[in-house]
Amino acid sequence: MNGLSVSELCCLFCCPPCPGRIAAKLAFLPPEPTYSLVPEPEPGPGGAGAAPSGPLRTSAATPGRWKIHLTERADFQYGQRELDTIEVFVTKSARANRIACMYVRCVPGARYTVLFSHGNAVDLGQMCSFYVGLGTRIGCNIFSYDYSGYGISSGRPSEKNLYADIDAAWQALRTRYGISPDSIILYGQSIGTVPTVDLASRYECAAVVLHSPLTSGMRVAFPDTKKTYCFDAFPNIEKVSKITSPVLIIHGTEDEVIDFSHGLALYERCPKAVEPLWVEGAGHNDIELYSQYLERLRRFISQELPSQRT
């Protein structure tokens, strides 16, 4: 079985690791932060007010208005006009971690806002160019957040924190911007499909997009795994059937990180799945470069979702 010796198999099944250890070994590679939050002056008597001093990197969350400062490694592809459409703030999760959030106003009066849970080795600074481009092309605003231990979010990455982090983002999006669930599309990419599936299994929303999803942590590490063990991490395969919103699954047939079979298995298990997008020849990190990616998203959002609402 996957090249494991008898002694290794005995160790695995007689003294199984906890899900948190599996998750930490498989999933989390937070980069060095590519951004900080810089305070903006608050309006006050005489037209000026006190703002929090210094950039926000790792200190406790403070009230106030913030602007994002990107490092060169963020490689922002747009100009100041687009940067000014990005609003950033910090919220707190139920596990007491500070969670950095980003709201990108791509389209005035957009019908939908995408709550985007990004992939593994990136943070909000590296993703914001993609968010500007994606939102503009599919006609949606984009809301995203950094997981605990990513970017300027505090704490450390863990499976439990992933679930608390997306809960905090969901609540912030709903309360801060007054956006109702039927106007929110949950979008998860790679490891981001884990919090996305968990949230979507508990709350109804406009739709769900699973981009290069995994079935579970054990199935990534040991591809011959056929059942979900109690010590498995990220058990998307056990939760996807509970989603009551339309689900679009996208996967590359040559994915070298999370095998294409994961996307197929989730599609077969998901009763609310719509026509999937299997991108022939695409790997784990290049699906966005194929023309059918945007074409399928546009059709899903502009044609299929409205028809399901009528």
Swiss-Prot record:
Tissue expression summary: Expressed in brain (at protein level). Expressed in hippocampal neurons.
Gene Ontology molecular function: any one: palmitoyl-(protein) hydrolase activity
The protein's name: Alpha/beta hydrolase domain-containing protein 17A
Catalytic residues of the enzyme: 190, 255, 284
Membrane disposition: Lipid-anchor
Keyword presence, Phosphoprotein: yes
Entry EC number(s): 3.1.2.22
